[in-house]
């Protein structure tokens, strides 16, 4: 098995990192998936990555049909439309990985195309998006982690390794991918959400016992849910229990979204934990408050509270 026809769905911070790395290979057919006005914009303006303009091949889902390997790197609220694109692209041999945040995107995708097409994965890249520009440090980026649910190395995980070889991408295969995914989810919930509510840099976690307490409350609820689902987060590699190195002023993706007046992925973070908590009978008061607080900040950004 060799992956030669590669399709990337999503050209934001994560998609740009993947495109940057794979564009260094000259023996693959690499494309970004887009349609309509967005397709025209990318073809005209390109992708501005670390102050360099890349002009990707842009294909519609129909044009990319039969791809060997599909990499999903969209925001959570774009997943439903991305799934429709995936359904158009996938055929019998196609392998799909999702590099989205959260713990349920693989399930959503597999429900539409079948679990046999999906290799669970995650990514850790400390990136910043400003307008149409994406910045990241390739050297400090932890990168892509992938593996089969049963922990066995397979023909398709070895094909992923061969694809990533010779690029600037950082990657590794793991035999405990579900623990790794939940470990990253734990980091995202603990690091993204308290600072997003406050609008401050990550240094606040070490400088304020009160912010640290909020983070602890959010994470304890997540830990209880993971335990109830049989996920042992402690099995994750040490690199999955920490984020990429950042400065105290750093603002993670949820706060970056609010700063730019974009809607966030709070449905995927606290929203998912609230849903799972209800299913399992586990209270989630910290996540419920955080969910409503960030939703209210989105409404504020939308201009809903501009009273005269």
Question: Where are the language model's segments positioned?
Answer:
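Short, charged/polar "capping" segments at the starts of alpha-helices
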Residues: 38-43, 106-107, 154
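Internal alpha-helical scaffold of NAD(P)-dependent oxidoreductase catalytic cores
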Residues: 4, 41, 88-89, 112-117, ...
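Rossmann-like NAD(P)(H) cofactor-binding subdomain of soluble oxidoreductases
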Residues: 50-134
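NAD(P)+-binding Rossmann beta1-loop-alpha1 motif at the extreme N-terminus of oxidoreductases
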Residues: 1-55
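Short, well-ordered alpha-helices that flank and scaffold nucleotide-derived cofactor binding pockets
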Residues: 20-24, 84-88, 111, 271, ...
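A structural signal for isolated positions on well-ordered beta-strands in alpha/beta enzyme cores
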Residues: 7, 29-31, 97, 145, ...
């Amino acid at each position: 098995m060799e992956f030669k026809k590669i399709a990337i769905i999503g050209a934001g911070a994560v998609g740009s990192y993947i495109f940057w790395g794979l564009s260094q290979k000259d023996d693959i057919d690499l494309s970004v998936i887009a349609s309509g006005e967005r397709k025209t914009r990318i073809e005209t303006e390109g992708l501005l990555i670390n102050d360099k303009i890349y002009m990707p091949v842009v294909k519609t889902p129909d044009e990319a049909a039969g791809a060997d390997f599909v990499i999903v790197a969209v925001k959570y609220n774009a997943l439903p439309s991305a799934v429709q694109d995936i359904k158009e692209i996938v055929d019998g041999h196609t392998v799909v990985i999702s590099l989205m945040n959260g713990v349920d995107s693989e399930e959503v995708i597999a429900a539409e195309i079948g679990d046999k097409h999906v290799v669970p994965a995650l990514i850790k890249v400390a990136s910043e998006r400003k307008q149409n520009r994406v910045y990241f440090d390739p050297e400090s980026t932890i990168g892509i982690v992938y593996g089969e649910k049963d922990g066995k190395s397979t023909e398709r995980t070895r094909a992923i390794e061969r694809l990533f070889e010779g690029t600037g991408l950082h990657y590794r295969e793991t035999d405990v991918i579900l623990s790794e995914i939940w470990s990253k989810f734990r980091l995202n919930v603990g690091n993204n959400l308290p600072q997003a509510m406050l609008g401050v840099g990550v240094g606040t976690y070490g400088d304020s016992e009160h912010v640290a307490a909020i983070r602890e409350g959010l994470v304890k609820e997540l830990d209880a849910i993971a335990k109830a689902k049989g996920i042992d987060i402690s099995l994750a590699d040490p690199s999955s229990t920490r984020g990429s190195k950042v400065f105290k002023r750093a603002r993670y993706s949820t706060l970056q979204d609010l700063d730019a007046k974009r809607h966030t992925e709070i449905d995927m973070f606290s929203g998912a934990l609230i849903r799972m908590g209800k299913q399992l009978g586990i209270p989630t008061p910290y996540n419920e408050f955080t969910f409503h607080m960030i939703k209210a900040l989105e409404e504020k950004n939308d201009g809903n509270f501009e009273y005269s």
